């Protein structure tokens, strides 16, 4: 795991913890807003993961095609 990934994970965990704490505030409107923010962040995060998986899959396919073409002898 890269240091950068580790830092991103810590920041994501910190933000999630902060939002969870703020969602327990007694003001129902504020709490609802924070809960909505949490859901939006979950959707964004899942979309980023989906895009990252597609990128890695496409990258592997391109690399395997490049490797196959380099093995062709004339």
Curated annotation (Swiss-Prot):
Keyword Phosphoprotein: yes
Coiled-coil spans in chain: none
Disulfide bonds: none
Post-translational modification note: Phosphorylated by viral F10 kinase.
Domain of life: Viruses
One Pfam family per UniProt: Chordopox_A30L
Keywords: Phosphoprotein
Database matches in InterPro entries: Chordopox_A30L (IPR009257)
Keyword tRNA-binding among record annotations: no
Described function: Required for the association between the dense viroplasm and the viral membranes to form the mature virion (MV).
Family classification: Belongs to the chordopoxvirinae A30 family.
Subunit-structure text: Interacts with protein G7; the interaction stabilizes both proteins.
UniProt protein name: Protein A30 homolog
Organism: Fowlpox virus (strain NVSL) (FPV)
């Amino acid at each position: 795991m890269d240091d950068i990934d580790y830092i991103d994970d810590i920041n994501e965990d910190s933000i999630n913890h902060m939002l969870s704490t703020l969602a327990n505030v007694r003001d129902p409107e504020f709490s609802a807003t924070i809960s909505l923010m949490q859901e939006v962040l979950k959707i964004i995060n899942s979309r980023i993961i989906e895009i990252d998986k597609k990128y890695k899959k496409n990258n592997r396919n391109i690399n395997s095609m490049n490797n196959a073409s380099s093995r062709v002898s004339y």
